[in-house]
Each structure stands twice: as C-alpha cells, then as structure tokens.
Amino acid sequence: MQIALLGLGKMGKNIAQKLLAEGHHVVVWNRSREVLEQFRNEKSEFVIKEQLHITHSIEDLRDTLQKPRLIWVMLPSGEPTERILEELRDGIVDHGDIVIDGGNANYKDTERRFKVFQAINVKYLGIGVSGGIHGLENGYPMMVGGDKSAYEYIGNILDSLAKPNGGHTYFGEGGAGHFVKMVHNGVEYGMMQAIAEGVGVLAKSPYKLNLVSVGNNWQRGSIVSSFLMWAAVSALIKDPTLAQFDGYIDAKGEGEWTVQVAKELNVPTPVIEQALEFRKRSQYDIGVQDTFVAKMVAALRHEFGGHEIHKVETKSVEEVSK
C-alpha cells in the first residue's frame, strides 16, 4: 500500500522503516530538512527502487498520493499535531481519504477531530501506539479508534507494523483508541513506580544483593515477570548503580489525563496518582532525584522508550505545577 508518514521522530522513523521493510510505498515528510535528507541517505536503496519518496512540502501530498489518500501523522500531541491536521483539512484531503493520528493525543481532542473530518467526508483514525523503540524489532501493539471502515481498509498496514509479536484492536468510534492508550500509559506509570520501589528496597538490603540476578530470577515465570522487568534488568546490566541517571523524571500528559478522567468517573486511582506525583517531585526535589527509585524510573523510560537522560536543571514547585 501507499502511505504518507508525517514526522520522523524516534517512533515515526521506526514506523517508516518497518513499512518499507514490509514492501509498502512510503512518502515521508518532516519539518526539518536535515532529518529528511539523513533518512533519504540511510534508506537510499528504497529511493532507488522508488519505494521511498521524500517530500519537503505538505501540499505535495495532494498530487503525490493515490486516492484514497492515506496519511499517518506521527508528531508530538497538542499544537504540532493540530497545526498539521488543519493544513491537511484545509486543502490536502477530501472525500474518502483517510487521516491517522498515531501520537499520544488526548482522547477528547481525537473525538473532536473525528467529527471535524467526518463533516468533510474524510475518515479519521486515532491510533495509540505502544512498543517504544523496540517496536521496530518486536512489532507494535496498536489501540485503534475512529472510522471502522478505515480501520478495515488499512488492515494490511497494521498487520505489517504488528509483526512479529505486536497486534491491533479496534475499540470503537471517535477517541476510543486514544482513551485505551491513555489508560495504558497510566497503568505503565504505576507499574514502573512499583518496580522501581522494589528495586530500591533491594538495593538497600543488608545482603548485598546482585540486582541483575534478582531481576533475572523474577523473569523466570514469576507473577511480576514482564517487559518492564526485562527493561529494568537491561538497564542494571549496563549501569548497576544507575550513576548516569540524575533522577529527573518527565511526566507526559497521559498519566495526568488518566488521573483527571478517573476523578471525573469517580474511580479511585491512588497508585497512578502517587506515581504521577513522584515524577513531578523529581523535577524540583533533590531529595527525590537522589534516590535509587527515581533513577530506576528514569532508567526504565530510557531503556524502553529511548527518552533522554536529563542533566538536572532544577525547576521550582510552581513551574512543575503549571
């Protein structure tokens, strides 16, 4: 199939690579020309085969793509995504085309956008994509919401991205997929915090435990075995003291949104809420930053998501609360 992918960040680049490897024809755009040219050079064999097309202009998509146009937006949530979607809506896509937002959008934004595109007869999908930087090799788990006929149409694309161990599920219209992904990330907050706290206790035990050995033991069929536990072991193998991590933990929107929605629905979420609060404190409280627990959460984020290792620029409580 032919698809345009807008955004060559960590996830977008890997998705483009996987689609090319699976034989799809991919048109890529990125705001930075340098990033585009680097990708062109890295994937020159696909350019030669005319399987990869680089475009510097969103407007080119109107004439470059076959009907129905299939455009996957993989940009940071909020303003960057909103701006590109407006460009697409105002002159690029029309009747029968399909637009996909594969970023971590707020499900309420997805619900609104679904209706806006529906009004101009463009099919809209919001797809929550998990798997981090390992999705390229392992396959992506995808949580889909929006137009069901569009989901069925792009099944071949999603099957390619899911190989070998991922998958995709349609959850309903509008923002359903991004709602499921939001809660997934909230659960992720709680699980990461629990693993980090457990490892923190082990690190201070009187038995001089080998943390990698403990983690490997727990991965052999125990109740707490998981991809996150694997990530913890992997991080500890590389840096047993986690000295390279400063204990500053970013808190993206999904954890906050999960807590907010839970309150709206009168659902208690103390574990997720405390994990979120711990992350916020790590951004200004040196006492938290210096703990093995905070360093472990930061290490987990880096290990599975490729998130940057911060050099602390301590923020005030007021800045973090904004």
Located regions from the model:
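Short, hinge-like loop/turn segments at secondary-structure boundaries
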Residues: 44-50, 117-119, 141-145, 288-289
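NAD(P)-dependent Rossmann-like dehydrogenase/reductase catalytic/cofactor-binding core
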Residues: 1-8, 17, 22, 29-31, ...
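Short, conserved loop/helix-junction motifs that constitute active-site signature segments
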Residues: 90-95, 266
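Rossmann-fold dinucleotide-binding core
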Residues: 81-84, 100, 106-197, 202, ...
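Structural beta-sheet core signal
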Residues: 28, 73, 99-101
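NAD(P)+-binding Rossmann beta1-loop-alpha1 motif at the extreme N-terminus of oxidoreductases
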Residues: 1-69, 93-96, 133-136, 302
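Beta-loop-alpha module in the N-terminal Rossmann-like domain of NAD(P)-dependent dehydrogenases
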Residues: 59, 71-87, 106-109
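Hydrophobic beta-strand scaffold residues
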Residues: 26, 54, 99, 124-125, ...
